Amino acid sequence: MAARVCLVHYHEVGLKGKNRAHFEHILMDNIKAALAAFSVNAVSRISGYILVTFNEHQADEAARVIRTVPGVARVSLAYHTNRDPQEYCAAAVKALREFGPFDSFKVHAKRSNTDYELTSIDINRQVGEVLCEAFPDKKVQMHDPDAMVHVLVVQGSVYVYARSERGVGGLPVGSAGKVVTLLSSGIDSPVATWMLARRGAVCVPVHFSGRPQTPDTSEYLVQDIIRALAPGVQIGRLYVVPFGDCQREISVTCPSNLRVIMYRRIMYSVAERIAHIEGAKAIVTGESLGQVASQTLENIMAVNEAVKIPVFRPLIGSDKQEIIARAEEIGTFDISTEAAPDCCTLFMPRRPETHAKLDAVHEAWELFDHEEMIERLLKQTEYIDFESNTYKAPKTLKRKHPQLASREIYQDHE
């Protein structure tokens, strides 16, 4: 009897040269981690594909999870048979029947080696005849058919499929280093975090809470966002910085029109310190050019110069509708639209500066002890750990930075 399996296709990983095996192993580990809730028998490499086999009938449900793992270009629900033509022809009938509505079809056979006596053309003809008998009202169409039945002869086995779903693509998480992301409970920053994860980066979010000036609702929502990104994108640690009191100090010390810029310079500076602790090489934000007052070119430059580490803005050229569409796709939109007071809405000026002058920014920056504030916030920072196979905590964290406090993961909340 043909076994149901998942064939995982990859694109960018396959373009790698001598490092290809390294990327494949990372992707395989990430697929295993994403399928922790499933009864997986094995995850293995076979001639340009990753094969996932199961102890139970779970392939259909597992395919929906696999396609969310960065690095996966496509997932095909396949039947695994031996080289007996009767078996793989019967599997082809099953595969085409499960495809859904169609009027035309084509068979595409491929051999990874030539030790099988039948050629690809022979297999095409053989399987095509059986399908024509099974579906007499359907027509064979060589160009642009509704359904394509693939027959792959690989390493002594045959894999047959017609259904194939697009994955998120990109590179496997853990193949491109570590970044710190400024993660709020809003719409933009979760999308920016996901986009960097899709390029292979291990993301370490830092959330600036309005606590104690506001409730900690946003902290719960950020944790929900992290869970929503899983299991495809697994985040191992969330840093929470209670920023409310410092915002209040800035609001009474600095010119009102420059408050937001001062807030963000402090946030970037704290994130940079955490990046050094974590061994991260960049900061990631959800800024989109011109979307709000703080995201004009002048204001971005005024904030950016507070840190030396690179700042990535993957959404900089996206409009709001594009960002919303992506948030809906990755499952964070509904969480991000829940009302929650946070540091982004706390002590906001009526007329924020939209074209900040650096001289004025530097003067405002010297009106308060920013170094002391950064150190104070770092001492008040807490972190929450989540299940992740890609995140590696800094080994010297507790010895060199005992001020950082671990906090238990919040469970269910109202």
Predicted segments with their positions:
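Short hairpin/turn module used for nucleic-acid contact or packing/dimerization
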Residues: V292, E298-E414
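A glycine-rich phosphate-binding loop feature that marks nucleotide/adenosyl-phosphate handling sites
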Residues: G48, V241-D245, S288, A340-P349
